[in-house]
Amino acid sequence: MLHPALALVPGEPAGVGPELCVRLVQQPRQDCRLVAFADPATLQAAAAALDLPLRLLPPEALPERPGDLPIQAHCHVHPTRFGHPDPANAPAVIAALCEAASHCVHGVLHGIVTGPVHKAVINQSGIHYTGTTELLAAQAECDVVMMLANPHLRVALVTTHLPLRDVPDAITAALLERCLRIVNTAMCGDFGIATPRIAVLGLNPHAGEEGYLGREELDVVIPVLQRLRAEGMVLLGPLSADTAFLPTKLIGYDAVVAMYHDQGLPVLKHSGFEQAVNITLGLPYPRVAVDHGTALDLAGRGVADPSSLFAATALCARLAASRALLSVRS
């Protein structure tokens, strides 16, 4: 594989996703070939709003100049109005994601880069939708882990979008073990780290204080870590979350596994939100998403920061190339 071919799915058409995609293709890429799965008219409208060139090509075509973008069309029921999402267009958004994923599962494409979606709008259309991560996992019939990353830090989550009161009961030995195995496999295969060092945070303050501040560490976390260490995994912890992110500590980790959403992600976003990306570990192909929302208030104005989409695309290309190299070696 000279360059991986990646699906580019803008997400919510009324948000900033389409214009960020237009910005993305203004420079020639040496690391991948992009194929958009989107509504052509929406991308053209975004290009016009930004006064940037855009030439949509057949899906198999090779870009020749700035603004060239191969596309697999998923036309909307109603014309897009930036800043005003329309539930009638949600089926096309979901269809674009599903077809892009199918192309990757069958080896036609080698990874997916996704823009931000609007969950409420999709659900208002009558489609039950909890998130793109869950959608892709169900389609591929596999277990996945959400990891967010920036140039300074990688944080994976044992639980994701749960009310805080539900988190302790959700953290079972089976879930934690599955999460750690997926993270370890991804760090070895996708990121090329032969022996990854994975820091595992405790659930409770001070990692439970030997049971005085909660028993989850003693009853669930430590037994799982001991079992996986016996297999050769390098797992540090359970660590107290209040000191685990000190710069002097972070240099000793390749990834951090946090027990819940707001335990790990605020630190990551503080350390570099603009270049933060969302990686779905465990899929049979790399999927990297932007780590920001639809920004409806900015849509069509040309002021949205494209850094996260640029970072997501570059990382997805690297991960796809890494998987291809591993496949050749095996």
UniProtKB/Swiss-Prot annotation:
Gene3D superfamilies: Isopropylmalate Dehydrogenase. InterPro entries: PdxA (IPR037510), PdxA_fam (IPR005255). Its cofactor is Zn(2+); Mg(2+); Co(2+). It catalyses: 4-(phosphooxy)-L-threonine + NAD(+) = 3-amino-2-oxopropyl phosphate + CO2 + NADH. Pathway: Cofactor biosynthesis; pyridoxine 5'-phosphate biosynthesis; pyridoxine 5'-phosphate from D-erythrose 4-phosphate: step 4/5. GO terms for biological process: pyridoxal phosphate biosynthetic process; pyridoxine biosynthetic process. Binds 1 divalent metal cation per subunit. Can use ions such as Zn(2+), Mg(2+) or Co(2+). Pfam families: PdxA. Its EC number is 1.1.1.262. Keywords: Cobalt, Cytoplasm, Magnesium, Metal-binding, NAD, NADP, Oxidoreductase, Pyridoxine biosynthesis, Zinc. Signal peptide: none annotated. The active site is located at the dimer interface. Belongs to the PdxA family. Homodimer. This is 4-hydroxythreonine-4-phosphate dehydrogenase. It comes from Xylella fastidiosa (strain Temecula1 / ATCC 700964). The lineage of its organism: Bacteria, Pseudomonadati, Pseudomonadota, Gammaproteobacteria, Lysobacterales.
